Amino acid sequence: EIGAIANEYGVPYLLDACQSIGQMSVDVADIGCDFLSATGRKFLRGPRGTGFLYVKQDWIERLEPPLIDQFAANLLDEKTYLLRRDARKFENWERYFAGQAAFGRAIEYAMDFGLPKIQQRIFKMADKLREGLQEIPQLEVTDQGRLKCGIVTFRHETLDAATIKSELARRKINVSVSSGSGSRLSFMERGIESVVRASIHYYNSEEELEHFLSKIRQLVA
């Protein structure tokens, strides 16, 4: 819907897909975006410091990178340079070669496993986790939206998110705390200070899910 509106009025549309790439199928043609960026370190399980940028062909021709080195363009004479004609004109000569190779392997791994299978598994497990959390007294699952993914967020009426995180860490369970820096208006509107964030992936088992829920029950009892 956003892509259709943006395209109708000629508004450039950049989509941050960091949380989507690697856990579900993403099609830039269906989305209608002009640009799409994503990181390698999240659901793709690639190295930190890696990522990629998609640029629609007509925008490649219209834009010039803010910084140009000998990779993005060829210097023809002392006053003239010739930019590359593909999206690699936005890259730099110096690069993280080891990370780039590992990132490529992470992408191959996900593609070999199959993104539809990955999405089905992640969404199924995340739904189970939400159901289990909703059964715990004084605990609220805070996820919204028509399509709920593998990122599960919740809060407790009396225990703050930071305390829950530290107590779970003592029990060798890793979660994170979201304080709303990326969704400040939504948090303010809903009266939320912070939430606990538990991310599910396809390699998580039902036994691990139940172990997590049992520790939450013990913690808030």
Locate each region found by the language model.
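Pyridoxal 5′-phosphate
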Residues: 1-221
